[in-house]
UniProtKB/Swiss-Prot annotation:
Domain of life (superkingdom): Bacteria
Active site as annotated: 52 (proton acceptor), 63 (proton acceptor)
One Gene Ontology MF term: tryptophan synthase activity
Protein name in UniProt: Tryptophan synthase alpha chain
Family label: Belongs to the TrpA family.
PANTHER family: TRYPTOPHAN SYNTHASE ALPHA CHAIN, CHLOROPLASTIC, TRYPTOPHAN SYNTHASE, ALPHA CHAIN
Record's keyword terms, sorted: Amino-acid biosynthesis, Aromatic amino acid biosynthesis, Lyase, Tryptophan biosynthesis
InterPro entries registered for this protein in UniProt: Aldolase_TIM (IPR013785), RibuloseP-bd_barrel (IPR011060), Trp_synthase_alpha_AS (IPR018204), Trp_synthase_suA (IPR002028)
Subunit structure: Tetramer of two alpha and two beta chains.
Functional pathway: Amino-acid biosynthesis; L-tryptophan biosynthesis; L-tryptophan from chorismate: step 5/5
Catalysed conversion reaction: (1S,2R)-1-C-(indol-3-yl)glycerol 3-phosphate + L-serine = D-glyceraldehyde 3-phosphate + L-tryptophan + H2O
Class of enzymatic activity (EC top level): lyase
Amino acid sequence: MSQQSRLANTFATARAEHRAALIGYLPAGYPDLAGSIATCRAMVESGCDIVEVGVAYSDPVMDGPTIQAAAEQALRGGVRVRDVFSVVEAITAAGGQAVVMSYWNPVLRYGVERFARDLAAAGGAGIITPNLIPEEADDWFIASATHNLDRIFLVAPSSTEERLVKTLEASRGFIYAASTMGVTGARDAVSSAAPALCARIRAHSDIPIGVGLGVRNGAQAAEIASYADGVIVGSALVSAAGEGLDAVRALTSELAEGVRSATVAS
């Protein structure tokens, strides 16, 4: 009855290699559209298993200053919602898996069914929806089922047990575990709340867990890879993208080494 997650093979491969999956992030259109395509390609070639392609949005309430500034630059450069599909196509062509990360408002404006259709046509695996809760996602449930797309919702240390269970039941592909409360951004120390949140998730579900918010180097990636199925890196890669492709390749390679060096929980 239920369709196979597009990302299931990616996580299964990583597990078979005794490592976590490396999940990168970049807004489409940063530093410009061609630059974002080249950057995402470099991420895949340097060890990213999955790339989250961000849809730049004018009111990014959950994003820290690095990602906000990148989104503003992309919007000033004239990026459109549909440009995200060009980036997704490039990631898929490079051999990576692409998911879109978007506030729900741009998807609603584009049209939920139309967005799902165009994302699937571009080879995308699903959507991460940071400000959408399952109770308000009826249109997305229908469209994601029609086009076999993964639904990746967020949970946080503050999520109640009831909220956690509801969100896990609604999710497919992986669950996005925000390891700290508050906005995104690279940090010196990774939150101690993340392992406890992962343990709570595993008490209810065997869905792969991606942990994000704060990773900026290989050592932190290794730390998270010891208890999570996926290590999500956003702000640090966006900062590297501002420096150029060599910086992106170097950081991605370091992170890819990190997720491989950890003693991974089986």
